[in-house]
């Protein structure tokens, strides 16, 4: 739904280096949903991890979905450190029945090293329970193999996933995708990386 507004094509820059974001207007997004709705599509995935970071963009979209009465079944991504209780009722009313959370790791030091937010201020279990309180299902995303990981920290991640027991869970092997901070860390440390883009898949 939004596009990273790069102001440089420097290969040594990663996504966090670019502050600007170009957004489609709420009207444009709603008109696209209208097209899908007329085709009989009821289930939508908002595959945009940044969608819920800016209220002035997502609130008009969700309110528009409610006003137009689409009766959708949607799922969306959210960062574990940006979930806000005052918005969850709106999410549910608009038809967001699933939130996929980037929980990533069970160990706090590993989470802090990921550079995705102030995880130290977040009680993951409370966030999951809060979302579920609004009858929204949680999909937990976990990753194994961060640079700070070892067998003990990866066991913590598995234990956290088992304890949270979310409605669904995905487990991934960490990959240093081109443009990510981990990619540049790997290059700097001369870690072996795939030679072709398709090999990152």
Placement of each model-derived feature along the sequence:
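Radical SAM [4Fe-4S] cluster-binding motif and immediate context
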Residues: 1-139, 146, 159
């Amino acid at each position: 739904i939004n596009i990273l507004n790069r102001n440089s094509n420097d290969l040594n820059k990663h996504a966090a280096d670019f502050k600007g974001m170009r957004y489609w207007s709420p009207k444009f997004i709603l008109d696209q949903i209208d097209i899908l709705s007329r085709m009989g599509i009821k289930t939508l995935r908002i595959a945009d991890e940044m969608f819920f970071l800016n209220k002035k963009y997502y609130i008009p979209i969700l309110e528009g979905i409610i006003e137009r009465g689409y009766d959708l079944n949607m799922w969306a991504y959210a960062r574990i450190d940006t979930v806000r209780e005052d918005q969850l009722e709106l999410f549910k009313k608009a038809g967001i029945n699933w939130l996929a959370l980037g929980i990533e790791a069970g160990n706090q030091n590993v989470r802090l090293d990921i550079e995705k937010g102030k995880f130290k201020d977040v009680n993951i279990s409370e966030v999951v329970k809060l979302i579920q309180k609004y009858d929204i299902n949680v999909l937990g995303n976990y990753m194994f193999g961060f640079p700070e990981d070892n067998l003990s920290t990866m066991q913590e991640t598995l234990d956290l996933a088992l304890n949270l027991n979310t409605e669904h869970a995905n487990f991934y092997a960490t990959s240093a995708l081109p443009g990510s901070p981990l990619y540049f860390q790997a290059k700097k440390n001369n870690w072996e990386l795939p030679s072709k883009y398709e090999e990152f898949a």
